[in-house]
Structure formats: C-alpha cells, structure tokens
From Swiss-Prot:
One of its GO terms (biological process) is arginine biosynthetic process via ornithine. This is Ornithine carbamoyltransferase. The lineage of its organism: Bacteria, Bacillati, Bacillota, Bacilli, Lactobacillales. NCBIfam families: orni_carb_tr, PRK00779.1. The gene is arcB. PANTHER family: ORNITHINE CARBAMOYLTRANSFERASE, CATABOLIC (PTHR45753:SF1), ORNITHINE CARBAMOYLTRANSFERASE, MITOCHONDRIAL (PTHR45753).
Length: 337
C-alpha cells in the first residue's frame, strides 16, 4: 500500500496538500506529548542523517540534532567549510555521494535550486531547513504554536510586519492560506511580497476560505489580528542594506502601540528568532552605535510581554522537524490523511 509521506522530501509548503500539512502539525503535537511524558519514539533507529549548513543557525541545527537523536538516528553536521556544494564539486555529484552514505539530508543555505537538486539526485528524503525563498520547517512550528494557543487554525488572522519579500513572509503567506488562516502583510510598498507569491497564496485562500491582505497601513493590517509576527529587518546575505532597512522599516516595528491597535487581549506575538529587541548583544550594540536604534523589529516591552510565544515557537521547531523526519523516513503506516 502507498504511504503518504515515506520517501518524500520536504522542500516547500506548496508541495503538500492542506490535509498533509495538518497531519504533520498534529503528528508533531503527538510527538511533543510523548517527549514530555518520557515515552521513547525511536522511529529512525539505525538511520544516519546529514545536516548541511551553508548558513549559520542555532534553532535549526539544535532542532534537527535533538530530533534525530530522539528518533534514534545519528546526525552528522557538515558546515560550509566541510562540503563542496557547487564549488569543487557539483551539487549533483555531492548529492549522489551523500545519498549513498546517509538515509536523509537536511539543507540550510541560500539557493532553493540547490536543495531541489539534492532531493533530485540523492535518492533519499531531503528537508529544507531554510533557503532564500522558503522556510517550511519554520511554518510547521509556527502554526503548531498558533494551534496550541487557539485550539484551531481556520478563520484566524495572522499579521506579518516587516520585510514582505523574505522567506518567512513567503512561507507564512502560502502555508497560512493553505491552512485557512487569513494572512496580512504589513510592509512598505518597496518590500511588498513578489506578485507570484501573492497570487499563489490567493489561490490557496480561495480554496480554504481565507483572505490575503498586503498593505502599508497599520490600522488595516492589524484589524482582526490574532497573531502578530515579525522577523529581522536584514536577512543573511543582505548586511550591506542595514541603513536603508532601518529607515524603511522603523514604522513597521512591533510595539505596544501596534499591539493596542489590534484590540485583542488574546493576541499572541511570534518571532522566528534571533530578535533584535535590545542592545545586549555585540550585534545590537553595533547597530545602536551606527544607526541610533536600540530596538529593531520588536520592542523589548513586547518581546517580554504576556503576548510573547516565541520561545514556545522555538521549542516547537524540534517537535515539528521530528514529525517530518519520522513521517518521511520512518516507514510509518500512514496510507492516507
């Protein structure tokens, strides 16, 4: 009998149906419960997992590592200086080699095409830990966190504030509308999402009964908001744009004034982290000295407020990544969803 997930890669939200995405979220909640109760779930006993990182990471690396170990697998970290992807060796050749040695591959880097080539040529499941276009494992964690707080997803409204063109905004739009969540992008016109991404999300919204709003008007954006979400103003690889982004995005900061506009005491705040909410880092101090900004995408007040759920969200990276790896590699009996 055909298994729904076995042997499949997890590269972008658009590759999955609503039912499949919901299944992975609910499976993650189940695995989280098993973890909390100390019940072993070694679905990947004896498996070897390659963790390829072109981009640095705290949460993605920690989540994949602990998830693999909890599932009984052995994770092997290969950083930017350990692999030859596209430099001394083609991605195709690297994929074919790694596919002979590992049972599954995680990739976190710049190019979506690269993770797709790894999946095409390795012969094993490949999981996208982040590319410049999509961040699908983050979405499972995000929407699990939302569901934990509201008991549902359909009909809720999520507002993303900031750079509407980045991978997180892309993924929130597509995954949210796929799941029946209304997604608002609150961003300057210069950073509105790409038209093809918006059209894709609108197609999902039509099917799920959700809606999409892209606006630079704060009152319009937060009307009916259940979730406020933000991300860093400058993505990895765009560090030369700091001054421009600080000036452009300051009006889109998540602060208490914006929270109050939403007029929802049950509102939650999410951030995929790291967050620049104070000057308690070398990075934060440097930005404050150069640009006179001590709080960037979110104020410290909101970050530490009763609305904040970002550390729950970060923990959920592990549980949702575990669900993806187990479902695609664990030979689990999932004939339909």
């Amino acid at each position: 009998m055909t298994q729904v997930f076995q042997g499949r890669s997890f590269l972008a939200e658009k590759d999955f149906t609503r039912e499949e995405f919901e299944y992975l979220i609910d499976f993650a909640a189940h695995l989280k419960d098993l973890k909390k109760r100390g019940i072993p779930h070694h679905y990947l006993e004896g498996k070897n997992i390659a963790l390829l990182f072109e981009k640095t990471s705290t949460r993605t690396r920690a989540a994949f590592t602990t998830a693999a170990i909890d599932l009984g697998a052995h994770p092997e970290y290969l950083g930017a200086n350990d692999i030859q992807l596209g430099k001394k060796e083609s991605t195709e050749d690297t994929a074919k080699v790694l596919g002979r040695m590992f049972d599954g591959i995680e990739f976190r880097g710049f190019s979506q095409r690269m993770v797709e080539e790894l999946a095409e040529f390795s012969g094993v499941p490949v999981w996208n830990g982040l590319t410049d276009e999509w961040h699908p494992t983050q979405m499972l964690a995000d929407y699990l966190t939302v569901k934990e707080n509201f008991g549902k997803l359909e009909g809720l409204t999520l507002v993303y504030c900031g750079d509407g063109r980045n991978n997180v905004a892309n993924s929130l739009l597509v995954a949210g509308t796929l799941l029946g969540v209304n997604v608002h992008i609150f961003s300057p016109k210069e950073l509105f999402p790409a038209e093809d991404i918006v059209k894709l999300a609108e197609g999902y919204a039509k099917a799920s009964g959700a809606h999409v709003l892209v606006t630079d008007n704060a009152d319009e954006a937060v009307k009916g908001a259940d979730v406020l979400y933000t991300d860093v103003w400058v993505s990895m690889g765009e560090e030369d744009k700091f001054e421009e982004r600080v000036k452009l995005l300051k009006p889109y900061q998540v602060n208490m004034e914006l929270v109050k506009k939403a007029a929802n005491d049950n509102l939650i705040f999410l951030h995929c982290l790291p967050a620049f909410h104070d000057t308690n880092t070398v990075y934060g101090k440097d930005v404050a000295e150069k640009f006179g900004v001590e709080e960037m995408e979110v104020t410290d007040e909101v970050f530490r407020s009763k609305y904040a759920r970002h550390f729950d969200q970060a923990e959920n990276r592990m549980h949702t990544i575990k669900a993806v790896m187990a479902a695609t590699l664990g030979n689990l009996f999932i004939p339909k969803v």
